[in-house]
């Protein structure tokens, strides 16, 4: 069911950040940084997958994501909702239910042969597909999923995520050059603002996180092990 009334984008961002902090999906550690898949250090880490275990928060954020897409793109803009393996699958299913649309998912690697080898579920020629994921950092990982969708003969010009890093300036260009618009609920800046408001991390940690967000490349270079 799609809610008939909902907060504006700014309030949804604040509430999303608050909920992510409440379930401890957000981790800040400047003294012992996390290691990203790239091998580079980061004082921040977020685990959106935890959301599936919190029904009230999960439902609220899926309502937010659904109305965000409808507000930004339209109420009748899509024919199919696709999730990326694996983190995007539960969220795609929940959004598809709210939008009363078919749901599919995209494999990271093909299974079998043919142009639908990476698609599970029914996706037809010419269908307008929304790609749903948990988060995006620099946008690069989304392109493989988009390409797999387009190989079926469907179109994919939009991706919706719960969380967008918003610290790498090339992200929107990377997606835009590929013909993909990004829709998100909140960013690290929203989380930082809410963390400061709640006082859930000490000042030294928040200061170091803010330095990272303003210039992640410089921070990573200075904190390489």
Swiss-Prot record:
EC class of the enzyme, as a word: transferase
Coiled coil: none
Catalytic activity, EC: 2.4.2.10
Reactions this protein catalyses: orotidine 5'-phosphate + diphosphate = orotate + 5-phospho-alpha-D-ribose 1-diphosphate
One of the GO biological process terms: pyrimidine nucleobase biosynthetic process
Keyword annotations from UniProtKB, A to Z: Glycosyltransferase, Magnesium, Pyrimidine biosynthesis, Transferase
Recorded superkingdom: Bacteria
GO molecular function, one term: orotate phosphoribosyltransferase activity
Positions that bind orotate: 137
Pfam families xrefs: Pribosyltran
Cofactor field: Mg(2+)
Subunit and interaction comment: Homodimer.
Similarity remark: Belongs to the purine/pyrimidine phosphoribosyltransferase family. PyrE subfamily.
Function: Catalyzes the transfer of a ribosyl phosphate group from 5-phosphoribose 1-diphosphate to orotate, leading to the formation of orotidine monophosphate (OMP).
Protein name (Swiss-Prot/TrEMBL): Orotate phosphoribosyltransferase
Organism this protein belongs to: Roseobacter denitrificans (strain ATCC 33942 / OCh 114)
């Amino acid at each position: 069911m799609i809610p008939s009334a909902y907060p504006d984008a700014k309030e949804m961002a604040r509430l999303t950040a608050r909920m992510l902090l409440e379930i401890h999906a957000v981790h800040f550690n400047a003294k012992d940084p996390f290691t990203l898949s790239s091998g580079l250090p980061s004082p921040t880490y977020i685990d959106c997958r935890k959301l599936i275990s919190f029904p009230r928060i999960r439902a609220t954020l899926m309502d937010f994501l659904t109305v965000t897409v409808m507000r930004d793109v339209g109420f009748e803009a899509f024919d199919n909702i696709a999730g990326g393996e694996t983190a995007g699958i539960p969220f795609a299913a929940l959004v598809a239910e709210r939008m009363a649309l078919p749901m599919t998912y995209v494999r990271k690697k093909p299974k079998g042969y043919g142009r639908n080898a990476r698609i599970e579920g029914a996706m037809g020629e010419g269908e307008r597909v929304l790609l749903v994921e948990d988060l995006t950092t620099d946008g690069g990982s989304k392109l493989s999923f988009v390409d797999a969708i387009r190989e079926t003969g469907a179109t994919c010009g939009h991706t919706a995520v719960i969380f967008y890093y918003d610290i790498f300036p090339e992200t929107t260009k990377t997606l835009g050059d590929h013909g993909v618009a990004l829709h998100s609920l909140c960013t690290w800046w929203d989380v930082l603002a809410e963390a400061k408001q709640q006082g859930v991390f000490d000042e030294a940690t928040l200061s170091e996180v803010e330095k990272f967000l303003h210039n992640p490349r410089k921070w990573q270079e200075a904190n390489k092990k």
